[in-house]
């Protein structure tokens, strides 16, 4: 179809629709109203549905959704359950931003069949790129449901296309929702997103866009050009909340959707609802508000204030607390969706976006002077939407705990960050700067947790400026698209393109995971050591599992396989010794002790993951793993340190599954069928770029898409021993454990150490703990005594000579591992004036003291920061004493002298 064909659809041409060009925006649109001149979209026309009857009056948002789904189900569309808001099946995005995200790229590219065709869905979606508009414009939401009907015309299959799609949209609006035909306009345009593009129609009713109908038949190239594809996808999106708002005629979408939560917040905060006249006039113009263009938005608000007859300042005083209420109501539902679908707040990925939203919500709470915990409001949302999202009810305790933990961390980080902010503002003022740089505001938020609102508030109190317009939106936009981690390229002296001449390797390790010996033919030898076989039982490194090793035996010799790796469908064996000739038959012998250890550890990983989710909660997701013959290092998402009781429970549960000797099933499934059967926990190890998935299932416990080698039954593992847990970054915890013989050897080693300790301490097994406590008490008492003696010695003074004198100020540098740097610096300063003292030790810990008589001229913090910059360190302090740690200690003398000289010159 040409562009003209999409514009002149039979539905319009044959049913009396009038085609016009909007004189305001210049776009082509269709209407049944002969009097209509403009397209009806914003900003071409004001809203005209506020306070008016537009169609039927649904009793709830749920009823509005049901009406839509029922309509399409009666027209042979299969209802499909919503997908999680976390797009774990994709590598390019973190969150689902539209219903089509559920089917990109696998279904849209025709690689796997859709779950139904055609289908209807109502998909919760999250978009944070308009975050600064939420609560202010009346229409923007961070979380919304996109109702959609999709048809997948894959290759030669025809379901339906553009004409039928437009007709369906017209019917659902008029026959289901009761909208008058002449009040609907269809605006023609182009759309792109998620790597695809196509012509589209925006559907407008009384100034409000309620749907977008996209006819996806292009792929977007990296340079932005459009490449036609053979598949034609009907991608529609109907805003559930917007349609409900349209039909109820509320002043804004927040009052329509979140009235129950907003009413509770009003009662607790004492924020009064603005007068109806003001709300009505503002609502009519709110479609034109966009705070990404602050000057235009403020001018619109000034016009409203003039119309209502109040000052602009009074308008802002009335609106600001209400905007905070609206934003808080929106944010807390989105937080419930994110945490309920497994996001753990952190400093990266989807966790970063969850933290961003939680911290913004906490600032809104403070602005409203509400004392209740943020988690309380999130739980209101879960209860309020319990019939729509019943799956979140069982996660309430988990979600409360996560939000409460985030709130505690936020308060702590703000307290710490205020000191950093104060130092920064002081530094800017000392340099004569009047504006806080944008990059510093981002750094304060990301590194120290200081909200931009606080930066602006403190900066203005110091006579500085801080522009935070659109801060949250920009930050969310920067972080919304996944930075696809490039897997480490194989460090080979050969070009992988040289492998193209070889056919795919037959993977014997999948046919029989305990196959120790096999025969194969040599297809090629590259650079004398990289051997390609027609089939192999050597598992190549992948999925966090190390490769097999062993030998290749052939007539006249043998070589050792020290590493195996996979390039595409070809397994390459890196050999030591004389490689076999091309065409030779070889016998491969796999090191089965290593293979079995790897199998036990990999299967144990699946078991431990199930135990982690059972004990800690469903928010636990794999964040990285390495399986070796001796141990497993497994990283997972979690928001708190693991308690000893939890560690014991996890280990006990994992070993119970081992002792139950459950079967471990391994089979191939079509991607769509696998997702239907097991959901998206399949992708614990990350997105799998394959149309057919190898599923490893421990019935009733765990099922994952996994390409590793595994035991046939859990009992083959023997024993799982957890060595410990540690937090490796915010929101990510690491567990290290052993399985099989390494676990047994570890336990035996612990027993040996206990026996040795009994001998050393001359204590029985039962009395060992008491003896250790007694020794610890004695050591602590002795350490206190030693400290007192050191302090007495320091009172007698420290013999040290100045290393330099700068403008009358003497510089002392003192090195000692015997005394703490702070104690030494203070001791030296007691007997000296007009001095700067730096004491440090071999660990790089240092203290910098400025004597009291110099405090009107010098600041230890200024000198200390300069020292840290030069010697790769960091620290903090007060005007007379700065403490920290430096990585380099060789040139301390020169650096402190230069730092002092610069500080004096600035005075």
From Swiss-Prot:
Subcellular location: Cytoplasm
Reactions performed catalytically: tRNA(Ala) + L-alanine + ATP = L-alanyl-tRNA(Ala) + AMP + diphosphate
Enzyme nomenclature, EC number: 6.1.1.7
Binding site for Zn(2+): 602, 606, 706, 710
InterPro entries: aa-tRNA-synth_II/BPL/LPL, Ala-tRNA-lgiase_IIc, Ala-tRNA-ligase_IIc_anticod-bd, Ala-tRNA-synth_IIc_core, Ala-tRNA-synth_IIc_N, Ala-tRNA_lgiase_arc, Ala-tRNA_ligase, Thr/Ala-tRNA-synth_IIc_edit
Enzyme superclass (EC): ligase
Entry keywords, A to Z: Aminoacyl-tRNA synthetase, ATP-binding, Cytoplasm, Ligase, Metal-binding, Nucleotide-binding, Protein biosynthesis, RNA-binding, tRNA-binding, Zinc
Cellular component GO terms held in the UniProt record: cytoplasm
Cofactor: binding details: Binds 1 zinc ion per subunit.
PANTHER family membership: ALANINE--TRNA LIGASE, CYTOPLASMIC, ALANYL-TRNA SYNTHETASE
Function: Catalyzes the attachment of alanine to tRNA(Ala) in a two-step reaction: alanine is first activated by ATP to form Ala-AMP and then transferred to the acceptor end of tRNA(Ala). Also edits incorrectly charged Ser-tRNA(Ala) and Gly-tRNA(Ala) via its editing domain.
Domain notes from UniProt: Consists of three domains; the N-terminal catalytic domain, the editing domain and the C-terminal C-Ala domain. The editing domain removes incorrectly charged amino acids, while the C-Ala domain, along with tRNA(Ala), serves as a bridge to cooperatively bring together the editing and aminoacylation centers thus stimulating deacylation of misacylated tRNAs.
Name listed for the protein in its UniProt record: Alanine--tRNA ligase
Lineage: Archaea, Thermoproteota, Thermoprotei, Thermofilales, Thermofilaceae
